[in-house]
C-alpha cells in the first residue's frame, strides 16, 4: 500500500488535490473535528484509489507497455483489491449508523362488495379493513456492513426497505429513522443515498459504459471535469466486474446484450455512481442463478467496505451469500422474528427448541420453520415473543461487545469527515478553512445541462433503433400512397368537393392515430424516469422539455413525407402557398397528437389500456370534428366536445385553405341536380328545368352558371368563425397544453412514495 501511495499519507493526497471527485456537497463553516492521525488508517477509500488509478494512467509510458514491465496502473489495480477486501472497521474513524425504531405501517383495504352482507350489516360494521405491513420493526445498520431483510413473499421485506429509503409518506409511517442519531431530511437523504429497484430499468441500446457515463453526467456536478467523470466510470466498471462487457449494449427481447447478472450490476452501478453513504436494494438477486447472485452480493460487499451502509431485501440466500452478510432481519407478516448476526442463528433457534441440523443451510431452515409456524394455529406469535425476550437477554452482552456504538460522531461531523476522506464524489474539496459544513444542492446540474444530457441519451438510444422511426414513416407513407391513389386528381364537381371533404377528414385523423406509438415508447421509459427523478438526478421539467424538443425532427420528416405524397397527387388548390400551409397543418396535427398521447401515457400505466383509451378518444374527436355532422346540428349538450376536438381545428384549417378562393366553382348549372333523382334525366330536360327556375327566381340560370363556390361549401360546413391561421395556432397551442399537463402528471404521479 505504501508503495502505491508514496511518501504522502492518504489524507494528505486527498486534501491536496483540488480536483478530487466528490459528490455535490459544499463544505462551509463548521468547526473542524479532531480526527485520528493518518497512521491509524490501514485502508484507502474508493476516491483515493480512484485518484491513484488516474495518476497511474497518466504516468504509464509506451515503453513500459512494449517491454512488458508492470505498469503503475497494475499497481493501482492491486491496490484496489486490497482496498476492496479491507475490514470494515478500518474504513472510517467517523462511522455512519442508521437506526430505526418501532417502524409501524398499515394500509386500509376495501372489502369486496357483497350484496347479501350489505343487507345483514349492522351500524357498527365497516367496509374497510386495516392490514398491518410493518409492526414495530427496530434495528441498526452500520457503515461497512451489509444488512439483509429476509422473509417469505408478503412478509414485509420490500415495505421495510421502502420505509428506510423514505419511500413511504411520513404521515403514514410511525416510528423513527435516524442517521447518527439525527433525523434525515428528505432532501439530504436523496443526496447521500441510493435505491436500486428490483427490476433492471435500463435503456436497451446503450452500452454498459455509456449507461454509467450518462448516470455520471446526471448525478455528478458540472464543476467536475469530464476527465474526472470518466475516471469515476472506469473505476466503477472495474469495481462491478464489468470490464469485459463495457462496450456491450444492455439489450432487450429483440437485441442480444449483457447477461442477467451483468445487467443487475449495471443497475446497481447506475445508482451508486455518486458513491452514496447509504444503499438500499430491493431483492438484488431476484431472477439470477447462484453464481450471478453471489457475484452481485460480492460487489455489494465491496461497496459496503468502501464506507457505505448497504441494506437489501433478499428472498433465499445461498450458503455462500450468507457468509458475506453482516446483519439479518427475518420478517413474518410484518413482525420481526429474528434480528442479529448470521452467526447467532444456531444459538437462537436452539434456545427456541428448534435447533438447526448440522450441515443444513441456516437461512433455509429458518425460512421453512417460519413458514410452518405461519400455517399453524398460533402462527409466529411464539417466535416473535421469544425474539423480544432473546434480544433483551442479549442486550448487555451486545452493548459490551460493541462499545464503538458510543463513539458515533454527529451527522455533521461524519459527513465532514467523509468529505475529507474523499468518500463522496463532488466538486467540493476540503480546503484549509477553519469552518466547514456540508451544504446540499437539490440537483447536481443546472436545467440546461440536464436537457442536453437527456436529449443526447434519447437520441443515441433511438439512433440505434432506426426501425422505430422506419415503421412510423412506413405507416405514414403507405397511408399517404393509398389516399393519393384513391383520391387522384379530384375535379371541381359536386362529387369532387364531397370527396375532398372525405380526404381531409381521413388525412387529419390519420395524423393523430399514427401518434399512438408514443404510448409504449414512454411507458418503456416511465420507470426509468421514476427511478432517476426519485433521487433528483434531473428535474421533471428538464425531461418534459427535452423530450418535446427531440421529438420535433421526426415529426417534421413524417409531415413532409405525408404532405408531399398527397398534396399534388390529390390535386389540392393553392399552389406553393397552399402546400406549405397544408404541410404546417399536418406538422401541427402530429405535434398536438403526440403531445396528447404522451399525456395519456403518463396517466395510464398499461400499454393495452392506453391504446384502447387513445383509439376511443380519437374516434370521438373525429365524430365531433364537423365532418360527420355539422356544428349547427350537434346537440347543445355535446357542443363542448366539438370545441375540444383536436381534429376540428386542423380539419377546418385545411378546408379553408382548399375552398377559400371565391372564384372557384364546384357546381355549374345542370350539376345542381347531381346527387338527386333529377340527375338521371337528359341534359336537355335539366336545361329546361333551369329555364323554369330562372323565371321563378328572377335570375337567368344557364348550364354554365356557377351555383356553388368554395365559400358556399365552407358555409354549408359551418366554418365561418375561425380563420385558417387561427386554426393552425390553436392546434399548436393544444400541443403545448398537453405537454404542460404531462409535466403535472409526472409531478403528481411520480412521487415514488406509498400512501
Swiss-Prot record:
The chain crosses the membrane at residues 468-488, 503-523, 552-572, 579-599, 609-629, 728-748. Its main location: membrane. One of its GO terms (biological process) is suberin biosynthetic process. The keyword Transport applies. SMART domains: AAA. It is found in: Membrane. Residues 449-659 form the ABC transmembrane type-2 domain. InterPro entries: AAA+_ATPase (IPR003593), ABC2_TM (IPR013525), ABC_transporter-like_ATP-bd (IPR003439), ABC_transporter-like_CS (IPR017871), ABCG_dom (IPR043926), ABCG_transporters (IPR050352), P-loop_NTPase (IPR027417), Pigment_permease/Abcg (IPR005284). GO terms for cellular component: membrane. Residues 98-358 form the ABC transporter domain. Keywords: ATP-binding, Membrane, Nucleotide-binding, Transmembrane, Transmembrane helix, Transport. It is a multi-pass membrane protein. Gene3D superfamilies: P-loop containing nucleotide triphosphate hydrolases. One of its GO terms (molecular function) is ATP hydrolysis activity. ATP binds at residues 151-158. SUPFAM superfamilies: P-loop containing nucleoside triphosphate hydrolases (SSF52540). It comes from the Eukaryota. Signal peptide: none annotated. PROSITE patterns: ABC_TRANSPORTER_1 (PS00211), ABC_TRANSPORTER_2 (PS50893). Belongs to the ABC transporter superfamily. ABCG family. Eye pigment precursor importer (TC 3.A.1.204) subfamily. PANTHER family: ABC TRANSPORTER G FAMILY MEMBER 2, ABC TRANSPORTER G FAMILY MEMBER 28. This is ABC transporter G family member 2. The gene is ABCG2.
Amino acid at each position: 500500500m505504501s508503495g502505491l501511495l508514496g511518501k504522502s499519507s492518504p489524507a494528505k493526497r486527498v486534501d491536496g488535490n483540488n480536483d478530487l471527485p466528490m459528490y455535490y456537497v459544499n463544505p462551509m463553516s463548521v468547526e473542524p473535528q479532531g480526527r485520528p492521525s493518518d497512521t491509524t488508517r490501514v485502508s484507502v477509500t474508493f476516491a483515493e484509489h480512484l485518484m491513484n488509478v488516474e495518476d497511474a494512467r497518466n504516468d504509464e509510458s509506451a515503453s513500459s507497455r512494449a517491454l512488458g514491465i508492470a505498469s503503475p496502473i497494475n499497481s493501482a489495480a492491486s491496490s484496489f483489491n486490497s482496498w476492496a477486501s479491507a475490514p470494515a472497521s478500518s474504513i472510517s474513524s467517523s462511522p455512519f449508523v442508521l437506526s430505526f425504531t418501532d417502524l409501524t405501517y398499515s394500509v386500509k383495504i376495501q372489502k369486496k362488495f357483497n350484496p347479501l352482507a350489505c343487507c345483514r350489516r349492522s351500524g357498527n360494521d365497516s367496509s374497510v379493513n386495516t392490514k398491518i405491513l410493518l409492526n414495530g420493526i427496530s434495528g441498526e445498520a452500520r457503515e461497512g456492513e451489509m444488512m439483509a431483510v429476509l422473509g417469505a413473499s408478503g412478509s414485509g421485506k420490500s415495505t421495510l426497505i421502502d420505509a428506510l429509503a423514505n419511500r413511504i409518506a411520513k404521515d403514514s409511517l410511525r416510528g423513527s429513522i435516524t442517521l447518527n442519531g439525527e433525523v434525515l431530511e428528505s432532501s439530504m437523504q436523496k443526496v447521500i443515498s441510493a435505491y436500486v429497484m428490483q427490476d433492471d430499468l435500463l435503456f436497451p441500446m446503450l452500452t454498459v459504459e455509456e449507461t454509467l457515463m450518462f448516470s455520471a453526467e446526471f448525478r455528478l456536478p458540472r464543476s467536475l471535469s469530464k476527465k474526472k467523470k470518466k475516471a469515476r466510470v472506469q473505476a466503477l466498471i472495474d469495481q462491478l466486474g464489468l470490464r469485459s462487457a463495457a462496450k456491450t449494449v444492455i439489450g432487450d427481447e429483440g437485441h442480444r446484450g449483457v447477461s442477467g447478472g451483468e445487467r443487475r450490476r449495471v443497475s446497481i452501478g447506475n445508482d451508486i455512481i455518486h458513491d452514496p453513504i447509504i444503499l438500499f436494494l430491493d431483492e438484488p438477486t431476484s431472477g439470477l442463478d447462484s453464481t450471478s447472485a453471489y457475484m452481485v452480493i460480492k460487489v455489494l460487499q465491496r461497496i459496503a467496505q468502501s464506507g457505505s451502509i448497504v441494506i437489501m431485501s433478499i428472498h433465499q440466500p445461498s450458503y455462500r451469500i450468507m457468509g458475506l452478510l453482516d446483519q439479518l432481519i427475518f420478517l413474518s407478516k410484518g413482525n420481526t422474528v429474528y434480528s442479529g448476526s448470521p452467526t447467532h442463528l444456531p444459538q437462537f433457534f436452539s434456545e427456541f427448541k428448534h435447533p438447526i441440523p448440522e450441515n443444513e443451510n441456516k437461512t433455509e431452515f429458518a425460512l421453512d420453520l417460519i413458514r410452518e409456524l405461519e400455517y399453524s394455529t398460533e402462527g409466529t406469535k411464539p417466535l416473535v415473543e421469544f425474539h423480544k425476550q432473546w434480544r433483551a437477554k442479549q442486550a448487555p452482552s451486545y452493548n459490551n461487545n460493541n462499545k464503538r456504538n458510543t463513539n458515533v460522531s454527529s451527522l455533521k461531523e461524519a459527513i465532514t469527515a467523509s468529505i475529507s476522506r474523499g468518500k463522496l464524489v463532488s466538486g467540493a474539496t476540503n480546503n484549509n478553512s477553519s469552518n466547514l459544513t456540508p451544504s446540499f444542492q437539490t440537483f447536481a446540474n443546472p436545467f440546461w445541462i440536464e436537457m442536453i444530457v437527456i436529449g443526447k441519451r434519447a437520441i443515441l438510444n433511438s439512433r440505434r433503433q432506426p426501425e422505430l422511426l422506419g415503421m412510423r414513416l412506413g405507416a405514414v407513407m403507405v397511408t399517404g400512397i393509398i389516399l393519393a391513389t384513391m383520391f387522384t386528381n379530384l375535379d371541381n364537381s359536386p362529387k369532387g368537393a364531397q370527396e375532398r371533404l372525405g380526404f381531409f377528414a381521413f388525412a387529419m385523423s390519420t395524423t393523430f392515430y399514427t401518434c399512438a406509438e408514443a404510448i409504449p415508447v414512454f411507458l418503456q421509459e416511465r420507470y426509468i424516469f421514476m427511478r432517476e427523478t426519485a433521487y433528483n438526478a434531473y428535474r421533471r421539467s428538464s425531461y418534459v422539455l427535452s423530450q418535446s424538443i427531440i421529438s420535433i425532427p421526426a415529426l417534421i420528416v413524417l409531415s413532409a413525407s405525408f404532405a408531399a405524397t398527397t398534396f399534388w397527387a390529390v390535386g389540392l388548390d393553392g399552389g406553393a402557398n397552399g402546400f406549405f400551409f397544408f404541410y404546417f397543418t399536418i406538422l401541427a396535427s402530429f405535434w398536438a397528437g403526440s403531445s396528447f398521447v404522451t399525456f395519456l401515457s403518463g396517466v395510464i400505466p398499461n400499454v393495452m389500456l392506453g391504446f384502447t383509451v387513445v383509439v376511443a378518444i380519437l374516434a370521438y374527436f373525429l365524430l365531433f370534428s364537423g365532418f360527420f355532422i355539422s356544428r349547427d346540428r350537434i346537440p347543445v349538450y355535446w357542443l363542448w366536445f366539438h370545441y375540444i376536438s383536436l381534429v376540428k381545428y386542423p380539419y377546418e384549417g385545411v378546408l379553408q385553405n382548399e375552398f377559400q378562393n371565391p372564384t372557384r366553382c364546384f357546381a355549374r348549372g345542370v350539376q345542381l341536380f347531381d346527387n338527386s333523382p333529377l340527375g338521371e334525366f337528359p341534359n336537355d330536360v335539366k336545361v329546361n328545368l333551369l329555364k323554369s327556375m330562372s323565371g321563378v327566381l328572377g335570375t337567368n340560370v344557364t348550364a354554365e352558371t356557377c351555383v356553388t363556390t368554395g365559400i358556399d361549401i365552407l358555409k354549408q360546413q359551418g366554418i365561418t368563425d375561425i380563420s385558417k391561421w387561427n386554426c393552425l395556432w390553436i392546434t399548436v397551442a393544444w400541443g403545448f397544453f398537453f405537454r404542460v399537463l404531462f409535466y403535472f402528471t409526472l409531478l403528481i404521479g411520480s412521487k415514488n412514495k406509498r400512501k
